[in-house]
Amino acid sequence: MFFVAIAACAFVQTQPVFAQTAPQVPPNAGRLLQELRPPVAPPPEVTIPPILAPAEPKPVAPAGSGDARVNVTGFDFTGNSAISSDELRKALAAWTGRALSFGDLIEAVEAVEARYKQAGYFLAQGVLPPQKIKDGVIEIGISEGRLGETRLEGESRVSSDVVFGYLDRLPKGQALTLPVLERQVLLINELAGGRASLDLQAGEEAGSTDVVLAQQPEELISGRLELSNYGSPSTGGNRISLNLNANSAFHLGERITASVMTTDTQGLASYGLRGELPVGSEGWRITAAATGTDYSLGGAFANLLASGFVNTLRAGVGYPLIRSRASNLKLLLEADTNKLVDKYKSTNTQIDKRIRGLTLTVSADALDEFFGGGSTRADLALRSGNLTFDLTDPGAFNADQLPAGPRTAGGFSKATLIAQRQQTVTRELSLQGFINLQATNKNLDSSEKLTLGGPATLPGYANGEASGDEGVLVKLAVRWQAMAEFAVSVFADYGRVQLAHSPASTTVKNYRRLSDAGVSADWVIGKGFTASAIAAWAGQEPPNPADNDRPRFWVSLGYGW
């Protein structure tokens, strides 16, 4: 199968017209950095099954009780501490002051259990002990579901001390709530190097429940190899990339990722190293990354003798405010520094810039049962930064500050909102929606703009067909999951960008509007092999240069392990 993938990619290499034609404006380091950024994460999927309380036998009516009824004037409770007796009596108002049968009393007990579950105490159970009814008061015994022991079974690459650090945050000997348990199990499953499934078992002490985690180790090394025609003719239309992950090599739940990518013409190459380390047992994570990108332009821009590079250092810290199966709310604060250099030997020109920035990202996602169920994700990023030029050669800075120049130097701020929705229609059919909005307070460098065109945004257009300081991108799709291994989608996209926040001229059009429509297909081929294909037709504005009388094709083949 791997050789089939190689052969298919070789076919792509013989068909460069299917990939894209070069835009009129030559790409620079900033725009190529945009081109290499990974696509936005999709809406969430459930990562663990629902956590359910162990099944308990239903109570049986005493022999000879028949249709006997008792006049109930009130209820008393034993064993409750998490919820007061007064609160529980309010939950049983409908059963008070009535003549109740045994079945009615069981319903009252179930109402008490429902009140506990509403508060998150999913292990709570109510019982009807032998009664000595006085003045019509019924006694209900409550087992609130105290946590007994926590145990690990199986093996993981993650140290048991690290895993127990998360389990030790559970309130041993106290009533256990579903949100607390669910959060810790999900956080454990985010650790690189292992997976864990939960089993709840009756504890040795009456009314207690033991938490047992069955662990399975992940491979030390995982990765993905991908071949695609996602590139640009000026730097190489066909790409090959490799990502390698070291999963918990130090048994701390950390992940270290090394990545490399190059094109068939070697006009573009990128390489990077990224690390992610959990800190403590509350969900804190620190990240650090170093990446580099080198390019040289060919094709229609070969006469420019242009080349350059981007070097990026990034560090961040993240924390999940809410972590559950149904909804999540996370914060991520990142600081970065980017050095961008563009060289043009044809004019003996060099542009040397540095951008330092700080970004706060708030991410929220949720699963719901609305009209058959669906998932929603939203990411709001607030970024503030500063662009400086290397003033050892002031020519680039002076050109930037001309009245007709881009005027990007100095401080800037921008806000980006990305929202997605996946709506289930039937088991096989779903609707997908996506919107990306960006606003800023000044003219931005090409690396900070909203860019349209390419397989991730508007596949009917070439990479970097249009970019602007502010704008909107809307994507709609209907997806049909024909079988577990194959899905096909029909989509339409629309994008509009304002080229400059503060244009140098008011007589020149300061925006571009693009639209496209097409069809895509995704395959899972055997174990680890994937393939995707996109055919898209440009719509509202023709591509630059125009060739909108035929579709643009994008193909990707991958193997993960």
Placement of each model-derived feature along the sequence:
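C-terminal transmembrane beta-barrel domains of outer membrane proteins
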Residues: N398-W561
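Periplasmic polypeptide-binding modules associated with outer-membrane biogenesis and secretion
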Residues: Q20-G231, M261-A269, A415, F434-L437
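Repeated loop/turn-to-beta-strand initiation elements of outer-membrane beta-barrel proteins
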Residues: A196, I221-G223, F250-I256, S281-T287, ...
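Transmembrane beta-strand segments that form the barrel wall of outer-membrane beta-barrel proteins
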Residues: I221-G231, L242, G253-D264, Y271-L273, ...
